Amino acid sequence: VELPRQAFLQKVIVPLFTRIGELWRSGKLKIVNEHMASVVVRSMLWDMLRALEIAETAPRLVVATPVGHWHEFGALVSALAALESGWRALYFGPNLPSEEIVYAVKKCDAAALTLSIGHCLNDKRLPLELLKIRRAVGRRMPIFIGGGGVVSVRQTAAEINAVVVDDLTAFRDQLERFMREASEKQH
């Protein structure tokens, strides 16, 4: 059975890792099992990322996870969703300090930034990291934030005028809306 890529991501990969996370947190799954599943799926997602070709002129989107956030599947899946929406997604991986994220945004001349926030309890650094990113990239840069840990930073997300996306469909809708609006401004 062949599924379209977005359906595969939304109906297989995302629920799979949600369930793996639940099992790990409840102690029913060993860390080694979670890591093994992660290696297999990460490799598959990387292959999918490399297989997609996007025009050089497509708007650039930096995708990463902030410092302290090591779970990268939300970011990888977001990068794939963005590529399929016509963006040149530039994936920089997990655990990046705000200064490095800002450097990537500026160096790559990104049109937008996507941050994946994993499940993280009591992450005292994250709100400050998000504020630093917003100050450095300016008020006009769209920042999309998603992932299981986004509930812990909803107030900060509102303060920095970030777009909180609750799932891949909402993320793709936001990306496509942004592209339409940018295109309308040019004409």
Residue ranges of predicted features:
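Long amphipathic alpha-helical segments
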Residues: 1-53
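Short glycine-/small-residue-rich flexible loop motifs, especially phosphate/cofactor-binding loops
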Residues: 21, 79, 154
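Short, structured coil segments at secondary-structure junctions
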Residues: 85, 139, 158-161
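Short glycine-enriched loops at secondary-structure junctions
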Residues: 14, 66-69, 149-150
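Peripheral docking tails and interdomain loops at the edges
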Residues: 144-187
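Short beta->alpha linker loops
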Residues: 12, 96, 121, 148-149, ...
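Conserved mid-sequence domains
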Residues: 36-135, 142
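Short, acidic/small-residue loops that bind anionic groups at enzyme active sites
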Residues: 27, 139-143
